[in-house]
Swiss-Prot record:
Cofactor(s), names only, from the UniProt record: Mg(2+)
EC number: 2.7.3.9
Subunit structure: Homodimer.
Location in the cell: Cytoplasm
Function: General (non sugar-specific) component of the phosphoenolpyruvate-dependent sugar phosphotransferase system (sugar PTS). This major carbohydrate active-transport system catalyzes the phosphorylation of incoming sugar substrates concomitantly with their translocation across the cell membrane. Enzyme I transfers the phosphoryl group from phosphoenolpyruvate (PEP) to the phosphoryl carrier protein (HPr).
Similarity remark: Belongs to the PEP-utilizing enzyme family.
Protein name: Phosphoenolpyruvate-protein phosphotransferase
Enzyme class name: transferase
A Gene Ontology cellular-component term: cytoplasm
UniProt miscellaneous comment: The reaction takes place in three steps, mediated by a phosphocarrier histidine residue located on the surface of the central domain. The two first partial reactions are catalyzed at an active site located on the N-terminal domain, and the third partial reaction is catalyzed at an active site located on the C-terminal domain. For catalytic turnover, the central domain swivels from the concave surface of the N-terminal domain to that of the C-terminal domain.
Binding, phosphoenolpyruvate: 298, 334, 456-457, 467
GO annotation, biological process: phosphoenolpyruvate-dependent sugar phosphotransferase system
Residues that span the membrane, as ranges: none
Length: 572
C-alpha cells in the first residue's frame, strides 16, 4: 500500500525513482571493548585504511569529471592523510600496546590531532584538522561495516531523501542521475529549494519526517507541482504520475516557442527577464530558457565544496566564462555572500546566536579584505569580456557602500598600473534586503547605479519571520502590503534618479507576484532559469496599465489575503 507525505512544492516537475537516503549512519561502538587478537585488529584497521583509499580515489576521480579539478583537490588532501605515518603508526601502536579495538584507537588518536591542529593560529593547520575529521569518519565506517552516503558516486536514477541539503551536498549532485529530492526541513526560499530550481529537478521540502518514513531503495514519486511525495506507489498511481510527467514535459516543449520572443505586455511595455545562477555550469539552462541576462550570479558557490579559498586566477576564469557566454547581455555579479545559511569550513567563522543578523556578506568582506580584494580584482579583470555589473549584498548603511566602492576603485587603479585592461562601463549596485536600506532608498539612489531587491531576506527581516522555520512560516508573506510598499518605495526612488531596479528573490518569478511587480514598475525580473518562459508567457498576456491600477490598490490592502484575492480578480 502506498503512503502520501505532504510537503512544500519547491521546484516544478514530477520525479519517479528509487529513494537514496542522505542521512548520517549510526557509527556508535563500545569504546571500552578490549581485543585479544591484536594482530587481527591491526589487520582490520589496515584493511579499513585500504578500503578508504579505494573509495576516496573513486570519489576523487568522479568529482574531477563532474565538478572539475579544483573541487576534486579536497579528496587529494584526504588521500594524503591516509598515507601519513605520523597518524597511522600511533593508531596501530594503541591497538598493540593497549589492546584497544580499532574504532577506539582511531577516534582517540585522530581526536588528539584535531584538537591540536584546531588550537593553532594557522589557517592551513586548521584546514588539516577538518581533513583528518572527515577521513577518520570514513575509516570508522569501514571498521564498523557501515556505508557512508555519497551523492557524488550515484550512478543510477534516484530521488535524494534527507533532512536538508547543504551547499556542499548540492555541489556533488549529478543531474544525470538525481531525478529529484525531498527533505524534512526548508521552505520555498531555503538553499535546497533554490538549488533544486537551479538544477531544474523536482523537489519537495518541509515534509518534517520523510527520512523516518522512507527506506533506502523505496520507489517514490516527487510531485513538485503539488507538494506531494508518494512512497511505494501502486501500479495505477505510477501510470497516473507518468502521464502527469509527460504532460509537464509537453508544456515545457510548448514554452520553448517563446525562447527567442520579446517580453512585452499587450499594451507594448517591455520587461527584462534575467536568470539567477550559482556556477558557470548553470549557463546551458540560462541560454535554453531565453534569459535576457543574468540578474544574480551567486559567487559563493566558487568558494564551496573545497578546502581553501579560490585564487584570483580561478575566479577570473569563472567570471570570464560567464561574461563571454552571455554575449554582451548584462551580468549582475553579487560579491561573496557567506554567513547565515551558507558557511565555509576553512574560514572558521564563530558561531553566532543570530547568524542571519551577524557577521556575513559585505560585513565579512569589509572586515577581511584579504578575501574581498582578490574577488574584486578578478571581477575587474574579467569586465572586458562582457557587460559586468557588480552588487554588494547585505548593505545596511551608505557608509558600507562607500567603503566597498572605495576598495573597488583602489583595486581598479592597482590593476591599471599593473597593465590590465579594465572596462569603464561597470555599474555598481546593492542588494536591498534590509528594511533600513529600503527606507533610505532615496539616499542610496543618489550614489548607486542600480538596486536589486533580495526579497528572500527582505521578507524575513521585515516580518521578523525566519524563512527556515516551519513554525512561523505563516508569517513569511511575500504579498504582505508592507513588502509591496517597500518594493514600491525602492523602485520609485531609483526612477527619480534615473536609475533602474531589479529583483532577484524568488518573488520575481512568482505568478501571483509578477502582475503586482509589473504594475509597480520593476525593470528587471531575475529568477531561476526554469521559470523564465512561464513568466514571459504570463507577462505577454498582461496589460501594464491594468497592472499599475492593480498594484496601486494592492498597496492599500490590509492583509496578504486581500492582496491575493485582488490579484485573482484582476488576473483570471
Amino acid at each position: 500500500m502506498s503512503k502520501l507525505i505532504k510537503g512544500i512544492a519547491a521546484s516544478d516537475g514530477v520525479a519517479i525513482a528509487k529513494a537514496y537516503l542522505l542521512v548520517e549512519p549510526d557509527l556508535t561502538f563500545d569504546k571500552n571493548e578490549k581485543v585479544t587478537d591484536v594482530e587481527g585488529e591491526v589487520a582490520k584497521f589496515n584493511s579499513a585504511i585500504e578500503a578508504s583509499k579505494v573509495e576516496l580515489t573513486k570519489i576523487r576521480n568522479n568529482a574531477e569529471v563532474q565538478l572539475g579539478a579544483d573541487k576534486a583537490a579536497i579528496f587529494d588532501a584526504h588521500l594524503l592523510v591516509l598515507d601519513d605515518p605520523e597518524l597511522i603508526q600511533p593508531i596501530q601502536d594503541k591497538i598493540k600496546n593497549e589492546n584497544a579495538n580499532a574504532a577506539t584507537a582511531l577516534t582517540d588518536v585522530t581526536t588528539q590531532f584535531v584538537t591540536i591542529f584546531e588550537s593553532m593560529d594557522n589557517e592551513y593547520m586548521k584546514e588539516r584538522a577538518a581533513d583528518i575529521r572527515d577521513v577518520s569518519k570514513r575509516v570508522l565506517s569501514h571498521i564498523l561495516g557501515v556505508e557512508l552516503p555519497n551523492p557524488s558516486m550515484i550512478d543510477e536514477s534516484v530521488v535524494i531523501v534527507g533532512n536538508d541539503l547543504t551547499p556542499s551536498d548540492t555541489a556533488q549532485l549529478n543531474k544525470e542521475f538525481v531525478q529529484g529530492f525531498a527533505t524534512n526541513i526548508g521552505g520555498r526560499t531555503s538553499h535546497s529549494a533554490i538549488m533544486s530550481r537551479s538544477l531544474e529537478i523536482p523537489a519537495i521540502v518541509g515534509t518534517k519526517s520523510i527520512t523516518q518514513e522512507v527506506k533506502q531503495g523505496d520507489m517514490i514519486i516527487v510531485d513538485g507541482l503539488n507538494g506531494d511525495v508518494i512512497v511505494n506507489p501502486t501500479e495505477d498511481e505510477l501510470i497516473a504520475y507518468q502521464d502527469k510527467r509527460e504532460r509537464y514535459f509537453a508544456d515545457k516543449k510548448e514554452l520553448q516557442k517563446l525562447r527567442d520572443a520579446d517580453t512585452v505586455t499587450v499594451d507594448g511595455v517591455h520587461a527584462e527577464l534575467a536568470a539567477n545562477i550559482g556556477t558557470p555550469n548553470d549557463l546551458p539552462g540560462v541560454i535554453e530558457n531565453g534569459a535576457q541576462g543574468i540578474g544574480l550570479y551567486r559567487t559563493e558557490f566558487l568558494y564551496m565544496g573545497r578546502d581553501q579559498m579560490p585564487t584570483e586566477e580561478e575566479q577570473f576564469e569563472a567570471y570570464k566564462e560567464v561574461l563571454e557566454a552571455m554575449g554582451g547581455k548584462r551580468v549582475v555579479v553579487r560579491t561573496l555572500d557567506i554567513g547565515g545559511d551558507k558557511e565555509l569550513s576553512y574560514l572558521n567563522l564563530p558561531e553566532e546566536m543570530n547568524p542571519f543578523l551577524g557577521y556575513r556578506a559585505i560585513r565579512l568582506c569589509l572586515a577581511q579584505q584579504d578575501i574581498f580584494r582578490p574577488q574584486l580584482r578578478a571581477l575587474l579583470r574579467a569586465s572586458v569580456y562582457g557587460k559586468l555589473n557588480i552588487m554588494f549584498p547585505m548593505v545596511a548603511t551608505i557608509n558600507e557602500f562607500r567603503e566597498a566602492k572605495a576598495i573597488l576603485l583602489e583595486e581598479k587603479e592597482n590593476l591599471k598600473n599593473e597593465g590590465h585592461d579594465i572596462s569603464d562601463d561597470i555599474e555598481l549596485g546593492i542588494m536591498v534586503e534590509i528594511p533600513a536600506t529600503a527606507a533610505l532608498a532615496d539616499v542610496f539612489a543618489k550614489e548607486v547605479d542600480f538596486f536589486s531587491i533580495g526579497t528572500n531576506d527582505l521578507i524575513q527581516y521585515t516580518l521578523a519571520a525566519d524563512r527556515m522555520s516551519e513554525r512561523v512560516s505563516y508569517l513569511y508573506q511575500p504579498y504582505n502590503p508592507s513588502i509591496l510598499r517597500l518594493v514600491k518605495q525602492v523602485i520609485e526612488a531609483s526612477h527619480k534618479e534615473g536609475k533602474w531596479t531589479g529583483m532577484c528573490g524568488e518573488m520575481a518569478g512568482d505568478e501571483t507576484a509578477i502582475p503586482l511587480l509589473l504594475g509597480l514598475g520593476l525593470d528587471e525580473f531575475s529568477m531561476s532559469a526554469t521559470s523564465i518562459l512561464k513568466a514571459r508567457r504570463q507577462i505577454n498576456g498582461l496589460s501594464k496599465n491594468e497592472m499599475t491600477e492593480l498594484a496601486n490598490r494592492a498597496v492599500d490592502c490590509a492583509t496578504q489575503e486581500e492582496v491575493i484575492e485582488l490579484v485573482n480578480n484582476y488576473v483570471k
